[in-house]
């Protein structure tokens, strides 16, 4: 195939469906939201004051035709989702088992989500496999 007929390289796609500048902005906003959540968690009720179906009644019965803005999604988390949670990291939550939430763990999950490695065997993720082998031998 000649160079004239060669497909032209496409620029790298944006990060998912979001521009990098938006990712940075909303990433910072969510980190701040999470930090505020943990800073003020002791002021929240451990258990939500609701009955089965209360949240469902506030959610749309059909999927949206178009995606919502991150501003609206974060507002929905703040207004609808967080108040409907059992707050396992609350200092007065003593049921089931101890929570394993930690700042370093959350940041580690963020890295894990960004790498999106499927660590099922060495070929799919040499770093994950070898790191796991070392840590398990400790």
What are these regions (language model features)?
Residues 2-138:
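N-terminal entrance/gating region of PLP-dependent enzymes' catalytic architecture
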């Amino acid at each position: 195939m000649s160079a004239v007929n060669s497909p032209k390289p496409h620029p790298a796609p944006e990060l998912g469906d979001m521009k990098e500048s938006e990712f940075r902005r909303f990433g910072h906003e969510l980190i701040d939201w999470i930090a505020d959540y943990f800073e003020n968690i002791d002021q929240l009720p451990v258990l939500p004051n609701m009955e089965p179906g209360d949240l469902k009644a506030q959610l749309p019965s059909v999927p949206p035709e178009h995606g919502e803005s991150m501003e609206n999604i974060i507002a929905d988390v703040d207004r609808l989702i967080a108040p409907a949670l059992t707050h396992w990291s609350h200092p007065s939550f003593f049921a089931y088992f101890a929570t394993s939430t930690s700042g370093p763990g959350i940041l580690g999950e963020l890295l894990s989500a960004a790498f999106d490695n499927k660590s099922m065997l060495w070929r799919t993720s040499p770093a994950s496999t070898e790191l796991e082998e070392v840590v398990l031998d400790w």
